[in-house]
Amino acid sequence: MGMYQPEIETMDRNELEKLQLERLQKQVKNVYENVPMYRERMDKKGVKPEDIKELKDLAKLPFTTKQDLRDYYPFELFAADKKDIVRIHASSGTTGRQIVAGYTRNDLDMWADCMARQIAAAGGDENSVVQVSYGYGLFTGGLGAHGGSERIGAMTIPTSSGNTERQIRLMIELGATHLCCTPSYAMYLGETINEMGVKDQLSLKAGIFGAEPWTEDMRHQIEQSLGIKAYDVYGLTEITGPGVSLSLIHI
C-alpha cells in the first residue's frame, strides 16, 4: 500500500481531530451565513455556529435528508456563489427527482487529492497506467477517477464504458496497470477477456471499483478472472464522487 499525501494520511489522531473540528466549525459557519434553509433549521433548534465547540457537538445539528436535496433543487442549498461554481454533477434520479452538486475549483482540487490517495493505496503512482472505464458525464465516476489519476501523475486512459473488446485491446496494448469501473463491468470485462483467451497478455495489478453494491463473492470472481487485487471505493454525489474512502484487505 502506498501513500500520496503521507503527512495527511499518517496524521496523529489528536492532530486529526483538531483539524476535523476546525473544518466542522468553518463549514457550519459557512452554511449558517449562506444557506437560508440551514440557518432556519439551526435557529429552530436553538443552535448557533459558536455552539460547536467539540466534535460531539455535531449531534446538535439538524439532519439533512435526501428529500431536502430534491426540494431545494437545483441551487438553494449551494453555499457558494454561482459564479464560483465551475462544474455540475448530478445523480441519476432513479429513486426520485435527481439532485445536483456544484463544485468550485477548490472542490475539484480536493476531490482529485482524495482520489489520488485511493489510487496510491491500491499501489498506483506516476509510473502506473490507469484505465478509467466508468461513464463520463453528469455521473461522478469517470471524471472523479480521471482527476485522481492525473493528480498522481499516472498515464490516464479515458475509455469510459462500453465497446468492451476495444477496451480490452487498449488495456493490453497500452499496458494498463489499474482499472477503475463498476464491479459489474469488471466482471463482464473478466468474462470477455477469458473468452478471448488473452488474460496472460494483461499487465493489470489492481482494480478500484465502486458506484454500486457488490459482494465478497464478486470480489473473488473479479480477482480470479482479471488476476488482480480488487478494492472497493466509496463516494456519493452529495459529497464527492469516488474518493471518499477505499476498503483495503490488509489483515
Where are these regions (language model features)?
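Surface-exposed charge patches
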Residues: 40, 117, 147, 169, ...
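Acidic/glycine-enriched edge-of-secondary-structure segments
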Residues: 96-110, 146-156, 173-180
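Conserved ATP-dependent adenylate/AMP-binding module captured primarily in the ANL superfamily
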Residues: 112-129, 163-176
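Conserved small/polar residues in nucleotide/adenosyl-binding loops
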Residues: 91, 249-251
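Short glycine-enriched loops at secondary-structure junctions
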Residues: 108, 135-137, 184-185
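Conserved AMP-binding loop of ANL adenylate-forming enzymes
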Residues: 120-156
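Nucleotide 5′-phosphate-binding alpha/beta core
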Residues: 1-90, 95-113, 117-121
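Active-site glycine/GP-rich loop and adjacent strand/helix microenvironment
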Residues: 2-15, 19-32, 36, 152-249
